[in-house]
Amino acid sequence: MARAKAAFYCTECGNETLKWQGRCPACGAWNTIVEQPDKDSKKKAGLPAPVGVDMRHPRLMAEVEAVDELRFHTGMNELDRVLGGGAVKGSLVLVGGAPGIGKSTLMLQICDNLCRFSSVLYVSGEESERQIKLRAQRLAIREEGLYLYSETNLDDIVAAVQGKKPDILIVDSIQTIYNGDSNSSPGSVAQVKECTMALMHVAKGLGVTVFVVGHINKEGSLAGPKVLEHMVDCVLHFEGEEHNSYRILRAAKNRFGATNEIGVFEMGDQGLIEVPNPSEAMLSGRPENMPGSCVTCVMEGVRPVLAEVQALLSPSAYGNSRRTSNGFDYNRAMMMLAVLEKRGGLALSNCDFYVNVIGGLTLNEPAADLALITALASSFRDKPVPFDLAAIGEVGLTGELRSVSAVNQRISEVRRLGFTKCLVPARSTGKIIAPAGLTLIRVSNIREAIAVLI
């Protein structure tokens, strides 16, 4: 006997149940369980089938013709890098970020570049067409080939795409679009899921490249159901600090390229400006002969980026010491503090602890461990690290230094930025080739590193 299908769902989290309940068992919200519309009664005629796909019969893999995905350049090298060499025709790209970070500005500047050789339909559910044009004029966006449409109804948007047949569709934002066949309100889990599914059919069925803007919630993750990120082809996070002009576009998912790639932009009066050399930008204005600062090199995808790690240790004036970390994983920073105290012989238990990564970068890889250890020891002893020195290496719980990946790429970037000395683990996997003018200082543990530098 076939199992009964779920007839109710939660409008907050999308959880499906067999019967009505006052409280959702998944998210705990009250009075959010509603009856699910009959799926068989929904009209699917407005959603085209994917191009070149036979939806009627299964096919042998040997019979499927393999064709390389057609890419095109967006006109922004940093965005092309994050997308894996350009946008793919018929792909669905989700761009998320905090309010005011510059998502709409990025989308308009993409329009300016793409309108030169293709037609673009810009759909906004948050601004009127007049407001979009005023903002476009401020950014000096070209008007030829760019269609503006202020609409939130999904059926009207799909009809406009089928009528205008644009090459690129931009939807700002997915939380404002609604499907009239659904009983839930715009922005709800069910609406976001259904609208994204419809846009996916538009992208695959008509071969239109779709960029969708998404909001983030208070936890910093994309608002809406988690399935939203599984449905799209690419997930891009647009990050930045409120009082910092630099913006970082990071790929969290990419079906057509590598993940963890980043693109760096600077927000100015004329919109977003690409930063082709992020290492130099992150180190601009670095003070000389100041304790508590050390430079390291991290890999963002295949791109080496130099980052300045700053640390401050000061005697605690109260009973409990304060511990804060900005841009460096808090748990890993606490681990480095404990290793330095235990294996490095420094009494840090009565000190307030502050860590900051300059430029808005977030360091998640272990290669920055040695730079943090060096900056902490420098701050504790109030002696500066040599200005022309960088530190690369992972630190274990016993205080030993371990090798990291892509060492030669990292030290080449270090030398390119004018550094003459680099602290590296004594034992590294593979042969390390030092560039001309760069001296490698090999150490086995943190005690040796502190003794050599400070």
Where are the model-predicted features located?
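Peripheral, non-AAA+ core regions of ATP-driven protein-machinery
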Residues: 2-12, 16-81, 88-94, 101-119, ...
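Divalent metal-dependent catalytic cores for phosphoryl transfer on phosphate-bearing substrates
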Residues: 129
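P-loop (Walker A) phosphate-binding loop of NTP-binding proteins
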Residues: 98, 125
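Conserved RecA-like ASCE P-loop NTPase motor core of nucleic-acid helicases/translocases
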Residues: 120-124
